[in-house]
């Protein structure tokens, strides 16, 4: 009965005997990149077919289109990792595992409800060729290999290696000793972390050089930010790794839609760290669903009046500028349109207060 319902054999089994024997002899099996690429090509054609079937109706097919978008991102990641392993053979084992995981993940999304994607179960890839790389035996052997030999070097240039080593040292020597108290005692991010990061130019990683940042004026380069974020997050995601996210979001918003006057005022201040910023999107009753944003922005004689509630605004206290998402047109359809971003200036303060409420018992 199971085979009739699911003829593509999506369930994973134990590794094959030959595969297991190779692992037991200390050899980590590998599959040729071209073999993975064939399966990834097959999956990409299914994604394209599904997109054509759904016709891009974001409201009607929101769940399916989100799944397809996520799958396309996974697919690109798998191709990128496999391409890196061609240049750096030390990455091949983990690339095999990652590609097998992506192939299985996407296939199983389709397998649950193929008809809603405009597919038939018989079109889905047979996972027999990749399932060995997801077996417990292979994963355990891969983990032991890394414990014994260390992780392979990532595929970055010499400049990025220097950046990585610098921020790894900072994370280990500065962030890690402070991280436990910050988390356990709900402390604010201290100046011992913020000030050195300002001096190292961290807040300008997404800002072009002409505005005092570190990003080249002539090309997009996010790899430096990725490397720094990864290393700071090793020390603490909350106390260091996520510090870069807010200035990046505000900088990109300013570069995309800000006036020249706004760019000249805000970008140098953000790049230097003189202006810490926060992003205010999430609302109490709707989370971060932009189609449901209710905070209103109404044009007045003196500018704009923002009226509504926001919550979970990281670094809101220490920030002197908030990037606020507000609804400027309540009648436009679809609902994810009619929104604008506002930069709201505020006094920066380093204080936290809590009000404890005793609520009546509700049955």
Give the role of each language-model region.
Residues 92-110:
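Charged, glycine-rich active-site and insertion segments that engage polyanionic ligands
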Residues 237-261, 287:
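N-terminal glycine-rich flavin-associated loop
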Residues 303, 307-353:
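A short core secondary-structure module
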Residues 356-363:
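Single conserved hydrophobic/aromatic residue that forms the stacking wall/gate
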């Amino acid at each position: 009965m199971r085979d009739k319902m699911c003829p593509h054999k999506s369930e994973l089994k134990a590794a094959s005997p030959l595969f297991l024997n190779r692992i037991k002899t200390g050899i980590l099996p590998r599959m040729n990149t071209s073999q993975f690429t064939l399966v990834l090509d097959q999956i990409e054609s299914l994604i394209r077919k599904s997109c054509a079937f759904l016709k891009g109706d974001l409201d009607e097919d929101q769940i399916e289109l989100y799944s397809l978008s996520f799958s396309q991102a996974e697919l690109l990641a798998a191709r990128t990792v496999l391409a890196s392993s061609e240049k750096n053979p030390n990455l091949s084992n983990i690339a095999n595992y990652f590609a097998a995981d992506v192939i299985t993940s996407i296939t199983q999304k389709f397998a649950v409800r193929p008809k809603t994607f405009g597919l038939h179960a018989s079109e889905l890839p047979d996972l027999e060729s990749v399932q060995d790389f997801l077996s417990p035996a292979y994963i355990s052997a891969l983990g032991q290999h890394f414990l014994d030999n260390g992780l392979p070097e990532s595929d970055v240039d010499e400049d990025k290696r220097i950046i990585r080593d610098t921020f790894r040292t900072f994370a280990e020597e500065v962030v890690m000793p402070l991280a436990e108290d910050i988390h356990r005692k709900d402390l604010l991010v201290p100046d011992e972390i913020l000030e050195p990061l300002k001096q190292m130019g961290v807040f300008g990683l997404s800002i072009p050089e002409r505005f005092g940042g570190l990003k080249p004026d002539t090309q997009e380069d996010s790899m430096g930010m990725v490397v720094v974020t990864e290393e700071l997050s090793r020390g603490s995601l909350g106390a260091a790794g996520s510090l870069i996210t807010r200035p990046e979001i505000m900088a990109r918003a300013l570069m995309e839609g800000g006036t020249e006057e706004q760019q000249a005022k805000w970008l140098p201040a953000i790049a230097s760290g003189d202006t810490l910023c926060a992003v205010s999107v999430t609302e109490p009753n709707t989370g971060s669903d932009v189609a449901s944003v209710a905070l209103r922005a109404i044009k007045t004689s003196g500018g704009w009046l923002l009226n509504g509630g926001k919550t979970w605004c990281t670094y809101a206290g220490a920030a002197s500028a908030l990037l606020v998402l507000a609804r400027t047109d309540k009648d436009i359809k679809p609902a994810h349109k009619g929104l604008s971003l506002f930069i709201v200036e505020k006094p920066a303060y380093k204080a936290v207060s809590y009000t404890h409420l005793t609520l009546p018992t509700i049955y």
